[in-house]
Amino acid sequence: MAEEEAGGLVFHPMDQFVIKPLFGEGPVNWYTPTNATLWMALAALAITALLVFGTRGRAIVPNRVQSIAELLYGMVHKMVEDVTGKDGLKYFPYVMTLFCFILFANFLGLLPKSFSPTSHIAVTAVLAVLVFAGVTVLGFVKNGAHFLGLFWVSSAPLALRPVLAVIELISYFVRPVSHSIRLAGNIMAGHAVIKVFAAFAAVAAIAPVSVVAITAMYGLEVLVCLIQAYVFTILTCVYLKDALHPAH
């Protein structure tokens, strides 16, 4: 945090993560329109616009919008097929939606005066719990009691199998925790560092260095936004594979 006593200005790197109502100053309830819901809606709108306008023409020689849409589609489709196999492709629409939402929410959060929904554990936890609940239900529907074979390491010595089963069970229920914290933590940390460098830009003596640092951090954050969307999605595919093929 940097303070400018004369002007009474206070810069705090965590102020950008405060959820505020869009209208008025009242308390935030579950039904209150907030800056978080606004930017999530904008992310959904941007995804819809890209996929609608990018696939509408279906030109043999694609334009830039169509190229981006086809690149995203092809990358996620290959990811799902490589990790889960052919039988996992029926769940591709959900995985594609998840990847695009996280990616666009991350990128929109880099705009000045914007808000990054994926920096909040409340948002990422909902995404992670939906994945966890979905693959768990799918595992039992597809495999019945055989889904429990995911926790029984048959290749291990018999004496160690009960211990490993407990460890596997604990690690399974920790999945949504690590899945959500990883995304929120990385996005929040990067945005906070950019805010810190921006605060130092107000000090004339170090302003040039601060501007260079902000530029470098923005470049790094673009990469982090892409990587975190990819990591969240590929872990979803791994969990989906466990539900479809639970045997160790």
Swiss-Prot record:
Subcellular location: Cell inner membrane
Record bears the keyword Cell membrane: yes
GO cellular component, one term: plasma membrane
Source domain of life: Bacteria
Topology of the protein relative to the lipid bilayer: Multi-pass membrane protein
Residues annotated as transmembrane: 34-54, 91-111, 121-141, 147-167, 196-216, 220-240
Keyword Transcription set for record: no
InterPro entries referenced in this protein's UniProt entry, alphabetically: ATP_synth_F0_asu (IPR000568), ATP_synth_F0_asu_AS (IPR023011), ATP_synth_F0_asu_bact/mt (IPR045083), F0_ATP_A_sf (IPR035908)
GO molecular function: proton-transporting ATP synthase activity, rotational mechanism
Listed Pfam families: ATP-synt_A
Keywords: ATP synthesis, Cell inner membrane, Cell membrane, CF(0), Hydrogen ion transport, Ion transport, Membrane, Transmembrane, Transmembrane helix, Transport
PANTHER family the UniProt entry points to: ATP SYNTHASE SUBUNIT A
Assembly: F-type ATPases have 2 components, CF(1) - the catalytic core - and CF(0) - the membrane proton channel. CF(1) has five subunits: alpha(3), beta(3), gamma(1), delta(1), epsilon(1). CF(0) has three main subunits: a(1), b(2) and c(9-12). The alpha and beta chains form an alternating ring which encloses part of the gamma chain. CF(1) is attached to CF(0) by a central stalk formed by the gamma and epsilon chains, while a peripheral stalk is formed by the delta and b chains.
Family label: Belongs to the ATPase A chain family.
General function of this protein: Key component of the proton channel; it plays a direct role in the translocation of protons across the membrane.
Protein name as catalogued: ATP synthase subunit a
